[in-house]
Design a protein with these regions (language model features):
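A generic structural motif
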Residues: 24-26, 36, 161
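Cleavable N-terminal export/targeting peptides
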Residues: 1-14, 170
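Solvent-exposed loop/turn segments connecting transmembrane beta-strands
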Residues: 16-30, 47-57, 149-156
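Short, hydrophobic/aromatic-rich segments at coil-to-beta transitions
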Residues: 12-18, 40-42
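Gram-negative (and chloroplast) outer-membrane scaffold detector with strong preference
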Residues: 32-142, 163
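C-terminal or late-domain output modules
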Residues: 143-147
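Outer-membrane beta-barrel "beta-signal"
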Residues: 155-170
Length: 170
């Protein structure tokens, strides 16, 4: 049914699921679709949220274009965007006792909120190696990084920070 609603999905040559980590791919669980015409895309997500809503969230989205492919692997270029969000309320618990060491209790201490987001985007070139139903890929992108932290937006630099993925495909 979904294949009929979305023609791009109907043309998919293979699907992948696995682990992704990198500057322009994001970090976390990844899902990818590769089309028979050499185009593909990938999304990744890893949310970590505490009970007090302190959070660290990684997410990413990438477009691929296969340059050359054979039975053991492929070479490709990509264009990716990743985001990293963090929030720390600074609140913590402290164990406090009176002067006699009696009447001890936990006391909540309020801290200062630290919140920010970093975006990393750019093109990259990668190689992928296949074994049966598994693929491992290493890519070197040129990641342009910008961020917002403590009410200040800024350019954080351009860095060749690699991307890595380990995927199961069908």
């Amino acid at each position: 049914m979904i294949s009929l609603l979305f023609p791009v999905t109907a043309m998919a040559d293979e699907q992948r699921i696995g682990f992704v980590a990198g500057s322009t791919h994001g970090v976390g669980l990844g899902y990818s679709r590769q089309q028979s015409n050499g185009h593909g895309w990938q999304v990744s997500l890893l949310p970590i949220v505490d009970e007090d809503l302190d959070a660290t969230v990684f997410m990413g989205g990438t477009l691929f274009r296969t340059l050359n492919s054979n039975s053991w692997g492929r070479a490709y270029w990509s264009l990716g965007l990743a985001a990293f969000y963090h929030r720390d309320s600074g609140d913590h618990w402290e164990y406090v006792c009176d002067d006699n060491g009696e009447n001890c209790r936990d006391v909540e201490r309020t801290g200062q909120l630290d919140e920010g987001v970093m975006f990393s985007f750019g093109p990259g070139v990668g190689l992928e190696r296949r074994w049966k139903q598994f693929a491992i890929a290493l890519e070197l992108p040129l990641a342009v990084q910008v961020g917002y932290n403590n009410k200040s937006f800024g350019f954080l630099g351009m860095h060749p920070i690699p991307n890595f993925s380990l995927m199961y495909f069908w």
